[in-house]
Each structure stands twice: as C-alpha cells, then as structure tokens.
C-alpha cells in the first residue's frame, strides 16, 4: 500500500527533513541558544497527517488491527534530518508537531492509540503494553478515564483492566505514575480505596496520603483528615519533604476542629521538616 511505502522510505532515511542551525542572540550574547529550523521539502508532514486520518477512519470502521499498526509505527518513528554539511539528530512525532510540521490534536491521537491497542490485545496484556506509551510526554498528560469515551464501541473487560492497571502502577515510581494511580483508584474504587492503597503503599507512593486528604477536604471531613495525617506521619520516611505538606493539612484540619493540642503537634512536625 502507499502508506507502507511511505513508512519504509521514512524508516530507511530516503525521505528526510532539511535543517538549518544558527545561534540565537535575541536574549543577549551570554544567553544565546542554538536553534535548529526544519524544512519539509519532501512533504513528510502531509504523508504523516494522511496516516493519522486513515488510522482514525480505521478505528471508526472497527478495523482496529490496521489502526494499531499505524499508531505503533507513528510513536516509534524517527524521521532523518540533515543539514548542508552533516546529518542531524532524527525527529520524532512530538518534535514534528512542536515545529508545526504536522497539525493534529495530539491528545486525541494518543487516546485513539490506546483505544486501538486495548481493542487488539488480550485482556491480560493490555495494562502492561499500554503503559509503555507513557514514556512519551503526550501520554503523560492523559487521564485514563477519557479512554472509555473516545471510540464508538464500548470497551470490554474493564474491571480486569483497572485491576491490572492499578497493580502495575503501584510498583512504579514517578510523579506521572502517582497521578495515574490516584486517578485510577478514585475512578474504580473511590476515596476509601485510595486510602487503603495509601496504607499499603506508603513506601512507593507516599503522595497518595496527600491525595486522600485533598479528597476529604472537599467534603470538610476534618476528623478523617486528622486521622489520615497521623497514620501517614507514622509510616512515611522521615526524610521525605512530603511529610511537611501532610502535616500542614492535618494542622489546618485540627484548627477547624478546635483541637489545639493536635494542631500544635502537627505544626511542630512541619517546623521539624523545615529545620532538617
């Protein structure tokens, strides 16, 4: 097919971007930075945008395998680049979009990618495979519950997916992983499930305690916030700065309840963290 030919030409470097680099002194001589301008003289952007449109048509027609093959290639693709004098670093899909060489809704593209991936994979492989995409910054900004509203067909086996997704994320470090874990548990198990996970997973994701307190704060449940704060501070590593944030929220809850002794106790924890 034409798409397959374009993919091969890009992979082999037969289709490439021209570049021109220069030193930008617009912020002053000492704050100059090297700027690379890309020139798409071979219409690569148009070809990739055609693939993106075709893949979405495949999703709408329930041809998920065909869509998935294109999406996988798009996110792994590297377009060669060369200046007049030498080869330059290759360019991925996100850099193409940042430099206006393609014009597409990257968030929707990412959600459709995950949707197609979900549809073609066996149930027990979905969470692990889909997580690999989150190395890309576009995916790192997604909210997974949006996945369930992007395609025409309702996704199946969602209970197993959420269980597998939560089991995978709870073992992973990182801010994105913590956010995804929090959102997944709140969506699937609610605030009590989030608190349960915080208790079990304090060493890997201590920020879950803070998320629980934030949720309780929305309902002005200050006694629960106090209790969470006490439990969190008894379990979280004493060197972590998040302890001061937890203690501060707990102190505020105590002040709302006129629990002066507890408020002073939590405030002392905040001061201790600052002075460490």
Place the predicted regions along the sequence by residue:
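Eukaryote-biased, non-catalytic alpha-solenoid scaffold regions
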Residues: 1-276
């Amino acid at each position: 097919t034409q798409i397959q030919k374009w993919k091969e030409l890009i992979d082999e470097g037969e289709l490439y971007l021209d570049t021109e680099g220069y030193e930008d002194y617009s912020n002053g001589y000492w704050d100059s930075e090297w700027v690379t301008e890309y020139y798409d003289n071979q219409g690569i952007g148009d070809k990739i945008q055609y693939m993106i449109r075709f893949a979405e048509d495949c999703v709408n027609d329930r041809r998920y395998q065909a869509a998935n093959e294109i999406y996988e290639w798009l996110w792994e693709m590297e377009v060669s680049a060369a200046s007049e004098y030498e080869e330059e670093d290759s360019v991925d899909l996100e850099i193409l979009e940042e430099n206006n060489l393609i014009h597409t809704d990257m968030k929707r593209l990412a959600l459709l990618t995950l949707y197609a991936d979900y549809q073609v994979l066996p149930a027990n492989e979905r969470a692990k495979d889909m997580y690999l995409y989150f190395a890309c910054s576009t995916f790192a900004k997604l909210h997974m519950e949006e996945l369930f509203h992007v395609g025409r067909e309702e996704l199946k086996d969602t209970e197993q997916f959420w269980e597998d997704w939560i089991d995978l994320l709870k073992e992973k470090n990182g801010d994105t992983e913590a956010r995804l874990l929090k959102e997944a548990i709140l969506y699937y198990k609610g605030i009590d499930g989030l608190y349960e996970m915080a208790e079990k997973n304090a060493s890997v994701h201590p920020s879950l305690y803070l998320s629980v307190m934030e949720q309780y704060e929305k309902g002005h449940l200050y006694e629960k916030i106090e209790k969470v704060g006490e439990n969190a501070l008894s379990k979280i590593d004493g060197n972590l700065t998040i302890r001061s944030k937890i203690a501060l929220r707990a102190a505020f809850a105590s002040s709302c309840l006129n629990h002066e002794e507890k408020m002073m106790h939590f405030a002392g924890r905040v001061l201790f963290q600052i002075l460490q």
